[in-house]
Amino acid sequence: MEISGLVYLIIIVTIIDLPYGKANNYCKIKCLKGGVHTACKYGSLKPNCGNKVVVSYGLTKQEKQDILKEHNDFRQKVARGLETRGNPGPQPPAKNMKNLVWNDELAYVAQVWANQCQYGHDTCRDVAKYQVGQNVALTGSTAAKYENPVNLVKMWENEVKDYNPKKKFSENNFIKIGHYTQMVWANTKEIGCGSMKYTENKWHYHYLVCNYGPSGNFGNEELYQTK
């Protein structure tokens, strides 16, 4: 990366350097969609953002707790039949939707991907015990401020307004509702997320990646069992 003039760049690292990259041989994992595993291809938590300027990466302990709480609060809202939005709403209550728990391995793989500063889904992120789903969100501003990660999670929640519970999951418009459906997928038990803040062309970006296991969004299944 070449930067003209004299620039003092301080990169703040808020994530613990987890041992999973060394403890697990991700290069042996074969994902259903094919491709090289993210943690094998990139190999570490070192940012690889090209001409983008890294401001900070990783999540604090409090941010992890807040993201997990936001997911579980929303899941319980839907499960209790309190989500009135939809196309049409309300969303039916669920009888098999449990709270998620944080998984550090999912978080590690999510952080490796976030550290590439490439908005979008990676190809292969599965872990040994299950297939892994993924939600991504990116916000940008010309002001030197970065969105709270919980607000990025709420962007996924807002997709519920386009979900039609009277249709099968596969009959809904996945592009409009896929983040919401992964959030409330009943068979998903664990979550782990990574975060990257960077600047490019005077814009300030916050990129959030959350990985979910077991993965949701299978076309022949339903989000959850209704009461």
Curated annotation (Swiss-Prot):
What is the predominant subcellular site recorded for this chain? Answer: secreted
**Where in or outside the cell?**
Secreted
Report, as the record phrases it, the tissue specificity of this protein.
Expressed by the venom gland.
Keyword Lipoprotein set for record? no
Keywords for the protein's UniProt record, in alphabetical order: Allergen, Disulfide bond, Secreted, Signal
Which Pfam family name is an example for this entry? CAP
Q: Which InterPro entries match?
A: Allrgn_V5/Tpx1_CS, CAP_dom, CAP_sf, CRISP-related, V5_allergen-like
The answer to keyword Secreted applying to this record is yes
Q: What positions does the domain SCP occupy? A: 68-212
- The residues forming the signal peptide are 1-23
Q: Which Gene Ontology CC terms are recorded? A: extracellular region
List all disulphide bridges recorded for this chain.
Answer: 27-40, 31-124, 49-117, 193-210
Recorded family membership: Belongs to the CRISP family. Venom allergen 5-like subfamily.
Q: What name does the UniProt record give this protein?
A: Venom allergen 5
Give the originating organism.
Vespula maculifrons (Eastern yellow jacket)
